[in-house]
């Protein structure tokens, strides 16, 4: 039974019954078993139910997803509602469900050519529309392509197309090497089947081989001799009854119209820039429709070639043709033919019918594909919509995977937006990933991480050979340098320069480069963090108060903390990461983002305070404002007597001033020189420098807004796609360079980046190596384990939460994560930094997210009107490694870096903080608080969770975030990592406040809870006794013995049951269509 195909018992509703030869080679399909949760067409017979029946329905719906049909059940159970599947859907499931190892069908380019008169004389095939995803029409008067738009079809044209496919010639998997050979094959087949009279063969062949005029070809100039030859040949063929024998006619045909036909593409085709929109393996589908005066009935053919073939100038672009649809009909129905051509072209651009067209084995398969399309089509009332209005392509296309899975036997399919994103949960979801499975062996997780990442080590270097990597290096380098200088300066203040800017540069370079070279996730960027800075300040003050050697005490804390981290690595403790749900991730990442935004504005306010603006200045009273440099005593000092001023330090004095002033006046000195030589500034305008603050804010806001605008420039309508992509990739570097140039041109003395120019420790009281013994009592070495425990929690939480955010499913990383390997290298680097008295480093959330954003990849070729699809992230080790190497070399680049204004870098900080909040569900829910109900976006969780529950969840998240912010700003900030760990406990407590249904859309379901839920369901099944003992212990879905209910989806009248005495609707439909078709 397992090796044979199961025949469809509902096949009596089909006109065509599959025989044994037809089903041979198909895999086994159990009709009614493993039915997905929902289909689009589901009819229910409603009636009033009693209390007992309601309970029964509730019990059935509770286990609905685990049940399946059994065919030999009693009819007493027929009231149980099951998904209804039409015969067309059954046939499509049979087609698409085949286990085929062949590659996926290629992208199709569909072109619609119509037979039209050129200059009112000669008939030619003229391109009028084309499709990849959306329709583009040739504008009648403008000689240009229209904007891509959604193809709107008349329902009547689809019915006409269906009848055409029923009556016309269907030729599948034919061999042809040229267009004349293909045309001759089609015409001969029509004659053999009695659809075409033999005496019309030459006329049809001549018509099908007419020249093709494409939109790219602006003119089709030919000599008068050629025109005359063509016209005379046509007149002889169509008007002279004694045209000779068929052989002579064929020779005339060949000489007159086939000489210009070539199998090779023309120059215009090769130069067509539209090829950039198509993938390399694309194939063509040509649709030829037109009206002629020598046919009494339509000439219809649908051809699929065994191998795609280049057919010369048949197609606008030089791609091989796989499909050909021909419709020639009598005069007077040109519009109808045009609409049928648009219908088949639109069907070929539909992803489901596209696959069916490639896999169809006969006519009935193609008709079933049309029926499926009709089942899914949406009809608009004629009085409420103007078909002439072109519908803009949507920003995000609905995935066709659900439709395909529904027919290919996919499970757990939910239609109409019922499925939560990312694997059924509301968030990124990482509970089931292989990297977080506990092995139970010593260093088992670490070994698996190494084995997982080792095969990709070589590709991690050559995958970086792209211009995008250069942009990412420059962007992250500037962010890292700014971060190193900022934290280095704060560490110097907190530790009395025992750790300063130079130590920050060196530590960042060494730790970051080693981590990016050997860690499990090289996209993660290491940096100093706020909690580490707080700990360093408290530790220094504690050592100073108790007369401990600070660096030695810090060394032992680092060693103990590294030892504890290695224990966590050896015991696979990283599996606890699966309890970091979206609630914890978003709380942590949002807090860090807000810190970046807050610090950027805080530094600008501090700058404005240092260079204040004179708010009392008035233009009309500018004579009352002055600032004069006065000497230290009231006696003026003669220039000749002043021997302390160097010649280059003297102010510039004009000859007239020298003439009138025999002695030198201190008023000519600059502010800096006045203070340098002991003078004092006197006046009510001293200290006010309005230009610096104003210019700094221009640079700050200009850098931020320009970066945001250029990052979105990729989707703008300006410039070609390549230029837009290049500008978007360098969206951060370009504003930095532009505003550095503006700052230099304006000449205002804004504060600049200060980089150490000498390679030596910041403090003369320390060296580059810390001795482990001799500075503190022996018991301090053991007591250091207590603060080390706190540092371990800090390192583990910071590192792993950032790793979870980096490895989210929505980033589509293909090379896997390495949580254990990452923590291992963080521990090793902590030992190195402790011995060298360098700052400790851990994963930086915001910079890591910025690193990923700068390396995102999108489809290079996208159909007109289609938004580029996100493919993933360029996973490699080169960008991070070079960033940290450049950071170490920054000491030698001080002469160049000193020209970068600090406000520009603060603008980069603001951009990173805001950009990392994009796409965070927490921010979307915050915006909902300010939106009226009618203006709220159509988020998936708003469809399934009451709004008050959404606001309650948001309120709890805001409350936790506020508490973390307050804690961070106080002396108790040292327990900050413990409070982040408390977020997991808060999220666990939400299970008692929210249902699992609500949490599955608003957050991730905690794995343990999910397992418990499944166990409870199994216990319920055992108690009810509805499952055999064999099924209780198996993993197979629970099934009830109920009959399959199969009602055709294309019926015109809904009936509860179908009897054999009445003809099926599929048999009646051709009669109905014959009265309403042009075919």
From Swiss-Prot:
Sequence intervals crossing the membrane: 467-491, 502-520, 522-542, 551-571, 586-609, 693-710, 726-745, 780-807, 820-836, 838-855, 878-894, 902-918
Subunit relationships: Homodimer. Interacts with CA2/carbonic anhydrase 2 and CA4/carbonic anhydrase 4 which may regulate transporter activity. Interacts with AHCYL1 (via PEST domain when phosphorylated); the interaction increases SLC4A4 activity. Interacts with AHCYL2.
Residue ranges within the lipid bilayer that do not cross it: 961-986
GO molecular function terms noted in the UniProt entry: monoatomic anion transmembrane transporter activity; sodium:bicarbonate symporter activity; solute:inorganic anion antiporter activity
Tagged with keyword Metal-binding: no
Source organism superkingdom: Eukaryota
Described purpose of this protein according to its UniProt entry: Electrogenic sodium/bicarbonate cotransporter with a Na(+):HCO3(-) stoichiometry varying from 1:2 to 1:3. May regulate bicarbonate influx/efflux at the basolateral membrane of cells and regulate intracellular pH.
InterPro entries: Band3_cytoplasmic_dom (IPR013769), HCO3_transpt-like_TM_dom (IPR011531), HCO3_transpt_euk (IPR003020), Na/HCO3_transpt (IPR003024), PTrfase/Anion_transptr (IPR016152)
Bias (Basic and acidic residues): 53-70, 1062-1079
Name of the protein: Electrogenic sodium bicarbonate cotransporter 1
Modified residues (Phosphothreonine): 49, 249, 254
Tissue: Expressed in acinar cells (at protein level).
Keyword Transmembrane: yes
Ranges annotated as biased composition (Polar residues): 251-260
